[in-house]
């Protein structure tokens, strides 16, 4: 193989590897895991029967907002609006049942 062809092939392989490494994130999942807000946008509604668990992260130095991340039964993580009245009622019920246990 001629040197220019080998360089072109190496560049193409490198580009392919970079694309594969960066395109693996499924849509609708929580993206950030660093010291910043994890919820870039929230879903207005979710079928609560599909929720496996909820994680509530209070405001702190990493993010000034309360974040609610729901893990769905299919393993997908989605951000929910912490101001939604139905979600607030569910969180209050969970907190009350946790205190009585």
UniProtKB/Swiss-Prot annotation:
Matching PROSITE patterns, A to Z? SMALL_CYTOKINES_CXC (PS00471)
- A Pfam entry, by short name: IL8
Gene3D superfamilies in UniProt: 2.40.50.40
Any GO BP annotation: neutrophil chemotaxis
| One function term, GO molecular function aspect | chemokine activity
What family name appears in the similarity comment?
Answer: Belongs to the intercrine alpha (chemokine CxC) family.
Name the CDD domains on file.
Chemokine_CXC
Report the record's disulfide bonds.
Answer: 37-63, 39-79
Q: Which InterPro entries does the entry link to? A: Chemokine_b/g/d, Chemokine_CXC, Chemokine_CXC_CS, Chemokine_IL8-like_dom, CXC_Chemokine_domain, Interleukin_8-like_sf
Q: Which SUPFAM superfamilies match?
A: Interleukin 8-like chemokines
* Gene Ontology cellular-component annotations: extracellular space
* Stated role: Ligand for CXCR2. Has chemotactic activity for neutrophils. May play a role in inflammation and exert its effects on endothelial cells in an autocrine fashion.
Task: Tell me where it resides.
Answer: Secreted
What does the UniProt induction comment state? By lipopolysaccharide. Expression increases until 4 hours after treatment and then gradually decreases, remaining high 24 hours after stimulation.
The encoding gene: Cxcl3
What SMART domains does the database record attribute to this sequence?
SCY
Renumbered to this chain, the signal peptide range is: 1-32
Protein keywords: Chemotaxis, Cytokine, Disulfide bond, Inflammatory response, Secreted, Signal
Q: What is this protein called?
A: C-X-C motif chemokine 3
State the organism named in the record: Rattus norvegicus (Rat)
């Amino acid at each position: 193989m001629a040197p220019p062809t080998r360089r072109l092939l190496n560049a193409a392989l490198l580009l392919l590897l970079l694309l594969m490494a960066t395109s693996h994130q499924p849509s609708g999942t929580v993206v950030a895991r660093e010291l910043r807000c994890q919820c870039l946008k929230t879903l207005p509604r979710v079928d609560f029967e599909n929720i496996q668990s909820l994680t509530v992260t209070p405001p702190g130095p990493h993010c000034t907002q309360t974040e609610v991340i729901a893990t769905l039964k299919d393993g997908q993580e989605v951000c929910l609006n912490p101001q939604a009245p139905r979600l607030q009622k569910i969180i209050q019920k969970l907190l009350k049942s946790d205190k009585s246990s």
